[in-house]
Regions:
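A short acidic, Gly/Pro-enriched loop at the edge of an enzyme's catalytic core
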Residues: 43-46, 107-117
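A short glycine-rich, Lys/Arg-flanked "PGG" loop and its adjoining helix->strand segment in the class I
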Residues: 63-67, 130-145
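Conserved alpha-helix/loop element of class I SAM-dependent methyltransferases that forms part
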Residues: 28-46
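Core SAM-dependent methyltransferase catalytic element
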Residues: 188-207
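A short SAM/SAH-binding and catalytic strip from SAM-dependent methyltransferases
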Residues: 113-130
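Conserved class I S-adenosyl-L-methionine
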Residues: 44-54, 82, 145-176
């Protein structure tokens, strides 16, 4: 087999593998969102934000749970991901999902718009956490909840460029998440260390 044929075969195999794994990934996301919804007491009509929504699988799963009377803000900072999110929202006819262009130091969410906000493996990427935390607090209604799903620093992974040095590598210690968000004015309500993929989940409340 010549080099071009080998490369083509490898690309086809990779694409087929990616497609075959997609249903499992979507199912895992749906299961994780159901657990998060139970913890945060989402109901039909709840307004939720997924910060750093990526490919949208968690935001779209959330949209099913809050129903047509609810709303999900899906925010992203990456242009390609934003375009894909908007395309998927249109393709799926998701009238209760709003895609927003987030910023490095701001969620771009309306003030006091959300009953619940979650960041899944996003917080350790924040380069301006103090300003971003203030934006998160502004975006929550009184009595609203914030969930941070993260993992501790892991060996073998390069630190994210531009983040504070106290992260200790790629990831973030749970202690720092708690310190930063309580300093922003939120109340710690629960920590869970049995989240999928060896992640942890920390819940906060805006009084």
């Amino acid at each position: 087999m010549n080099k071009k044929l080998f490369l083509a075969a490898a690309l086809i195999c990779a694409a087929l593998t990616s497609v075959s794994l997609l249903p499992r990934a979507n199912a895992d996301a749906a299961d994780e969102i159901k657990r998060l919804a139970a913890l945060m007491d989402w109901k039909p009509g709840t307004i939720v934000a997924d910060i750093g929504a990526g490919d949208g699988r968690y935001a779209f799963a959330a949209a099913q749970l809050v129903g047509s009377s609810g709303k999900v803000f899906a925010t992203e900072i990456d242009r390609e991901k934003l375009a894909n999110l908007r395309s998927q929202v249109t393709k799926r006819h998701l009238t209760n999902v709003v895609v927003l262009d987030s910023k490095e130091a701001d969620t771009n969410l309306p003030a006091e718009c959300c009953d619940a906000i979650f960041l899944r493996r996003v917080y350790h990427h924040l380069t301006k956490p103090v300003q971003f935390d203030q934006a998160l607090v502004r975006s929550l209604k009184s009595g609203g909840q914030l969930a941070i799903i993260e993992f501790p620093p892991r060996s073998g992974l390069e630190p994210v460029e531009g983040v504070p040095a106290n992260r200790g590598g790629h990831g973030i210690p749970q202690k720092i998440v708690i310190e930063e968000l309580t300093s922003a004015g939120l109340q710690l309500t629960k920590t869970l260390n049995d989240w999928p993929a060896d992640d942890y989940c920390v819940l906060f409340l805006k009084k």
